[in-house]
Amino acid sequence: MHALQAALGARDILGTDSGDNVDMLTLASIDHVVLTVRDIDATIDFYTRVLGMTEVTFAGDRKALAFGAQKINLHVAGAEFEPHAARPAPGTADLCFLAAVPLAEAIAHVRACAVAIEEGPVPRTGATGPIESFYLRDPDGNLIEVANPRG
């Protein structure tokens, strides 16, 4: 059993009780999400320079942004890879990332990159409990939340 499954009380990745009956699908984590963007170069610059992600090229010339054990695949508006969302559009995402540094350092870095802080720091509730967050926008206007867990 995976550590996350054990922590969440999940039986196994397929949700089986004894291996005989599948009663539900149990998901373990997010592998990747897709952002549809207007300008892939501006997006890569923002996410690497401001948020510290790593540019990844895969499957020929496809682009992604890696961080932690996750990635964001990038699709250019009007030239999306199949299959894709029913109505892919730039600027429609609202994403929250956990920072690997104290929030004050993250805020100082974002400001040093001449990116406006839209709100924060403010208390919020994350997937595993209380967080402290601040908000900014990427080049397409997606709302980006950067957070630290609160003790």
Regions found by a protein language model. Give the residues of each.
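Glyoxalase I/VOC metalloenzyme domain signal
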Residues: 1-4, 8-31, 35-57, 67-119, ...
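Short, small/polar residue-rich loop motifs at catalytic or cofactor-binding pockets
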Residues: 59, 128-131
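Short, basic/aromatic recognition patches
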Residues: 118-126
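Low-complexity, intrinsically disordered Gly/Pro/Thr-rich segments
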Residues: 121, 130-133
